[in-house]
From Swiss-Prot:
Organism lineage string: Eukaryota, Metazoa, Chordata, Craniata, Vertebrata
Modified residue annotations for Phosphotyrosine: 742
Name assigned to this protein: Arf-GAP with coiled-coil, ANK repeat and PH domain-containing protein 2
Organism of derivation: Homo sapiens
MF-aspect GO terms: GTPase activator activity; zinc ion binding
Residues annotated with Phosphoserine modification: 384, 387, 521, 581, 584, 775
Arf-GAP domain mapped to chain residues: 399-520
Length: 778
């Protein structure tokens, strides 16, 4: 090892030694600056490299997304996937290179600066200190007078000790300098050599990777050449076709006038028509119309679900309209509404009218089940019947209201005469009927029975689930409880007079209902059969403020679902397994224990039985209470004059509310606090119930004793869904008032949004649970 500073000169402490030290110290200082700069540049390079890797990964993800987008093109998908995988390997190689760079350059050089240079600086400080002490000792020794022997000896001793210490520290300092000068060469070369080997490994790995990819790239290049040739050929063909088409006469749309009743895809005719809106402005909008499956439907965009104009063409007529200013207009009239349409020309108008008339005639000739009809709210796109959507395919394959209702026990035959395959229903009773019995039910009046067709009418989701929750077996156990005891035989199909007498005795006179005695007045019964804890729990609902009540409902987790579909307590039947309500499945233990205090329903007043059963979501018991004469609007004076409908809201069941409303419940009847069902549903965050009550005419302007209407409660609770529904209903109400007595029932936007909320509340209630889930977080 070549010495930078000589040890002999060190002992002499000569000017040559001091000059050598000064030179070495300056060199070390400059070395430290260079190394610090190199380390900082290395760190910046590594950070930039990591950022490059991150950006490169994002670029690779973009290539993969493009490959997935090109899934229909095997060549593009395969090549992009293969290239992205190879480039991902290169990113991994880059990551390894940066890690090795960090270890070889940054870590090693930083360690050299922090360890070796620090030792040098420490030795320098000690040397400078002892040098200063030596100089002081020499000066003091020179200044001592001869006649002061004691001071002479003391100065001599200090000088001797200081010189010895100086020589020792100076030798250590010189050794540290020489070692540092030697080590810096090895450290710098070692780190740079490691760095170069890292690059060698990086490029070698990249070479191996692309050597394997090379043959595929050559094949792809040859294939690309063929694709370019094919593309040029296709371009020439399209240019020729374009030139040929340009020579045709497009002055008329005769090519679009054809319709085919026997079309393979079921579409008789389709094309653009102008449709007059039902809003206040009576605007005309251009929509894509089609006639298919004996229905007239339209849509705005291809991805939109078609809106059904006419459910069944057999129930409508079509006629020319010459009494309005716009040309080429015709009107499609059904029993419930009419639709004004406008074609682009007289030929197109005649073609559409003829297509509708032909479809009507064809519909009358056809036989069989109508299960392939489009559903008004979730029918598949007219142009995408093969889109692969399972739920839409199910509807096309026959999962209709008829099938879903008839699969309930007892519903496969008429509830009153036993005739098979009934296609009518009484929606407030929850039973299926044959066509003859349905006519008799109509004659009873809607206060006894509301009749609807299972095949021709539109079924709202909550009403369909109500039908699935009851059924002929459940209702007959109530209304035919004493038929066998009384020795009465049910009428047979075809016996019109016997049927009429039997049905009137069954539902109007209720002769066959099992009568039970009522020995207690309603207040006495409540005091006897309702525990104090139960009353406190029930009444505590009304003591909360809007915010507290929402949090309480979220904590109890008993009302976290608005669907209202629950298991019947009689037979445990789950009406619609895909949308079982969490209300009936997760009821708190305390409330179940209190509900057991109600004991046998035979000991309850019918009104109180209906009241309790509404909270328990027990539809069979509710039907039994109504059969025994319960007032559907009975108010419980012991519990704030709450009604069965309010109890159904507190119980969290949408179907229970629907059942009470179908049987005449007053949607605006309020308790002593001035809160109606809409208030309670808003406070609890039950979006599905709010939607149902607004559709049934609930007064959202009514205020409670605190002066709050449902909208202000929803705004305070920050429930966006309910605020949207209330404001939309209020806007629709104002629009109807502005149109006067003969205005339309509401614009299409209002109807579409409420239809969507009804669908979600019944079929996807978890989508409306956002408010409860957010409340649980707090």
């Amino acid at each position: 090892m070549k010495m930078t500073v000589d040890f002999e000169e060190c002992l002499k402490d000569s000017p040559r030694f001091r000059a050598a030290l000064e030179e070495v110290e300056g060199d070390v200082a400059e070395l430290e600056l260079k190394l610090d700069k190199l380390v900082k540049l290395c760190i910046a390079m590594i950070d930039t490299g990591k950022a490059f890797c991150v950006a490169n990964k994002q670029f690779m993800n973009g290539i993969r997304d493009l490959a997935q987008y090109s899934s229909n093109d095997a060549v593009v998908e395969t090549s992009l996937t293969k290239f992205s995988d190879s480039l991902q390997e290169m990113i991994n190689f880059h990551t390894i290179l940066f890690d090795q760079t960090q270890r070889s350059i940054k870590a090693q050089l930083q360690n050299f600066v922090k360890e070796d240079l620090r030792k040098f600086k420490d030795a320098k400080k000690q040397f400078e200190k002892v040098s200063e002490e030596k100089e002081n000792a020499l000066v003091k020794n020179a200044q001592v007078q001869r006649n002061k022997q004691h001071e002479v000896e003391e100065a001599t001793n200090i000088l001797t000790a200081t010189r010895k210490c100086f020589r020792h520290i100076a030798l250590d300092y010189v050794l540290q300098i020489n070692v540092l000068q030697s080590k810096r060469r090895s450290e710098i070369l070692k780190s740079m050599l490691s760095f170069m080997y890292a690059h060698l490994a990086f490029f070698h790995q990249g070479y191996d990777l692309f050597s394997e990819l090379g043959p595929y790239m050559k094949d792809l290049g040859a294939q690309l050449d063929r694709l370019v040739v094919d593309a040029a050929k296709e371009k020439r063909e399209m240019e020729q076709k374009h030139s040929t088409i340009q020579q045709k006469d497009f002055s008329s749309d005769d090519s679009k006038l054809e319709y085919n009743v026997d079309a393979a895809n079921g579409i008789v005719m389709e094309g653009y028509l102008f449709k007059r809106a039902s809003n206040a402005f009576k605007t005309w909008n251009r929509r894509w119309f089609s006639i298919q499956n004996n229905q007239l439907v339209y849509q705005k965009k291809f991805k939109d679900n078609p809106t059904v104009v006419v459910e069944d063409l057999r129930l409508c007529t079509v006629k020319h309209c010459e009494d309005i200013e716009r040309r080429f207009c015709f009107e499609v009239v059904s029993p419930t509404k009419s639709c004004m349409l406008q074609a682009d020309s007289e030929k197109l108008r005649q073609a559409w009218i003829k297509a509708v008339q032909t479809s009507i005639a064809t519909a009358y000739r056809e036989k069989g089940d109508e299960s392939e009809k489009l559903d008004k709210k979730s029918s598949p796109s007219t142009g995408s019947l093969d889109s692969g959507n399972e739920s839409k395919e199910k509807l096309l394959k026959g999962e209709s209201a008829l099938q879903r209702v008839q699969c309930i026990p007892g519903n496969a035959s008429c509830c009153d005469c036993g005739l098979a395959d009934p296609r009518w229903a009484s929606i407030n009773l929850g039973i299926t009927l044959c066509i003859e019995c349905s006519g008799i039910h109509r004659s009873l009046g809607v206060h006894f029975s509301k009749v609807r067709s299972l095949t021709l009418d539109t079924w709202e989701p909550e009403l369909l689930k109500l039908m699935c929750e009851l059924g002929n077996d459940v209702i007959n156990r109530v209304y035919e409880a004493n038929v066998e005891k009384m020795g009465i035989k049910k009428p047979q199909p075809g016996q019109r007079q016997e049927k009429e007498a039997y049905i009137r005795a069954k539902y109007v006179e209720r002769k066959f209902v099992d009568k039970y005695s009522i020995s207690l007045s309603p207040p006495e019964q409540q005091k006897k059969f309702v525990s104090k804890s139960s009353e406190e729990k029930r009444l505590s609902i009304s003591k909360f403020g809007p915010g507290d009540q929402v949090r309480a409902s979220a904590q109890s987790s008993v009302r976290s679902n608005d669907s209202g579909i629950q298991q019947s307590s009689d037979d445990g039947r789950e009406s619609l397994p895909s949308t079982v309500s969490a209300n009936s499945l997760y009821e708190p233990e305390g409330e179940r224990q209190d509900s057991s205090m109600f004991l046998d329903s035979k000991h309850l007043n019918p009104g109180l039985q209906l009241y309790r059963a509404s909270y328990e979501k027990n539809l069979p018991k509710m039907a039994e209470a109504l059969a025994h004469g319960a007032d559907v609007n009975w108010a419980n004076s012991e519990e704030n004059k709450a009604t069965p409908l309010i109890q159904a809201v507190l119980g969290g069941s949408l179907v229970t509310c629907e059942f009470l409303l179908q049987n005449g419940a007053n949607v605006n009847q309020r308790d002593v606090q001035g809160r109606g069902p809409l208030h309670h549903a808003t406070v609890l965050g039950h979006t599905g119930q709010v939607c149902l009550f607004l559709k049934r005419g609930a007064n959202q302007h009514a205020t409670d004793e605190e002066g709050k209407d449902p909208l202000s409660i929803a705004v305070e609770a920050a429930n966006a869904d309910i605020v949207t529904l209330l404001r939309l209903a209020r806007m629709n109400e104002e629009m109807r008032e502005s149109e006067g007595l003969y205005g339309q029932p509401g614009d299409e936007t209002y109807q579409d949004i409420f239809r969507d909320f009804s669908q979600m509340a019944s079929n996807n209630p978890e989508k409306l649970n956002r408010f409860q889930q957010d409340s649980q977080k707090f």
